[in-house]
Amino acid sequence: MAATTGLETLVDQIISVITNDGRNIVGVLKGFDQATNIILDESHERVFSTKEGVQQHVLGLYIIRGDNIGVIGELDEELDASLDFSKLRAHPLKPVVH
């Protein structure tokens, strides 16, 4: 029996990825491999700040190496669309320390 990562159900869905260096990248999961390298389409990075609203930097088609992924989660599109990111303030995430 082949091992599964649980990502199969997220293909073609909008996901949020927190990387080990503290970045938050959102996009449509297009594919992945056995090393959990992932391909995102229509992606953007959300940059958080305590002084100004969330900045969103367009990345487009983007590949993230599996060894740089901290967390992958499905995004609730309705809830996400209801947020006013221009008014949202938060401390940036710190890198993961092993």
From Swiss-Prot:
Keywords: mRNA processing, mRNA splicing, Nucleus, Ribonucleoprotein, RNA-binding, Spliceosome
Tissues and organs where the protein is expressed, per its UniProt entry: Expressed in roots, leaves, stems, flowers and siliques.
CDD domains from the UniProt entry: LSm8
UniProt xrefs under SUPFAM superfamilies: Sm-like ribonucleoproteins
GO cellular component: Lsm2-8 complex; nucleus; spliceosomal complex; U4/U6 x U5 tri-snRNP complex; U6 snRNP
Example of a GO MF term: RNA binding
InterPro entries: Lsm8, LSM_dom_sf, PTHR15588, Sm, Sm_dom_euk/arc
Cellular localisation: Nucleus
Family: Belongs to the snRNP Sm proteins family.
Quaternary structure note: Component of the heptameric LSM2-LSM8 complex that forms a seven-membered ring structure with a donut shape. The LSM subunits are arranged in the order LSM8, LSM2, LSM3, LSM6, LSM5, LSM7 and LSM4. LSM8 subunit interacts only with its two neighboring subunits, LSM2 and LSM4. Interacts with the prefoldin co-chaperone subunits PFD1, PFD2, PFD3, PFD4, PFD5 and PFD6.
The protein's name: Sm-like protein LSM8
Species this chain originates from: Arabidopsis thaliana
Gene name, Swiss-Prot/TrEMBL: LSM8
